[in-house]
Amino acid sequence: MELLSLSQAVAQQLDRLDFSALYPGYHRFPFALYNEERVCLEGQLFPWDDRFLGNTSIEYEGQRIAIWSVALDPLPPVSLAASMAHEMFHCFQFDQGEHRFPDDLRLLNAPAEQDFYQLKLAENCALAIACRTGDAAEFRRFAALRNERAAHFPQIAAEEWKAETIEGMAETVCLRALRVLDPAQYAEALACYLAKLENELPLLFDARRLCYYTGTVLCLTLERLGLPFYNDFTGTTLYEQNRPTDALCFEAPEVPALAALFAEHLKEQQTTLAAHRQARPFHPCEAAICGYDPMNMFRLDQWLYCSHFLFIRQDGAAQQLHGPVLAQLAPGSDYRIIGYYCCLLYTSPSPRDRG
């Protein structure tokens, strides 16, 4: 569908939504669809420029707008309208003084310990069951397992809960919009999310992506159980504001398949890093990371692998390193590098951070 026609079709679907019913006080924001050549912002067409990157919320000429790349993520109008409700909620979060953003690079630094993932899988399964069945005991079991994991791995848990707060809340709004626009598609999407938590073991190793699903299912479980929902934008994370206070102690069952998958996952990462180091030259470089694609990167020890791109800042100038790029982090740092393996780079006046 042509860009203007698609934008009009999405706008018609958005007209069907009562935004304040999706979330108290929430309202519609301007949106733009774009491809490699053109942008359509609220029915107005103009040439694309590099302010339009990814699917996110940006500040554009003094106002917050939601943007979506129809070239990278083509969707039919109903699905795209629901997705725009997600991105518009990011605009709303900024307006409400949201501050609970995760540290993406710290979120990558998950412990290379099987127990961490064993607990994570058990808590995800309990959450999925609670959402599907409305069983309050399973919700308390989920909270107990999560609290246990957080006690052993507090730093990574804190970043996960922040990511859940930002992305899970926005994705909840997306699914609530879909529930209005196409109830059958909503039911299918929710079933898919629950299946991901219970069965998609590789997703355990993609912390940021997983938080989209855990945060959404957490919100929908509270809704299913008829529990009060708290989300003070200037307060603690979504989970901390809504976790049950009577959670008991539970043990995570062993899952043999997870042990094998965990070993395979580590081996694949090690192989990727070794092949990259062998195939590309090393460039010594003391610089700060200033932009990245959080959905397409991983970290192993002091190595940060970015399949798409990485922006660094050195002596006040920003550079884009074209992916794949492998950066060597400075000892004890999540944001400073001492060099990288990469073929190409170019100077850019405006590095792009995550959205």
Where do the model's predicted regions map?
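Short, hydrophobic/proline-enriched secondary-structure or compact coil segments at domain edges
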Residues: 27-34, 303-319, 343-345
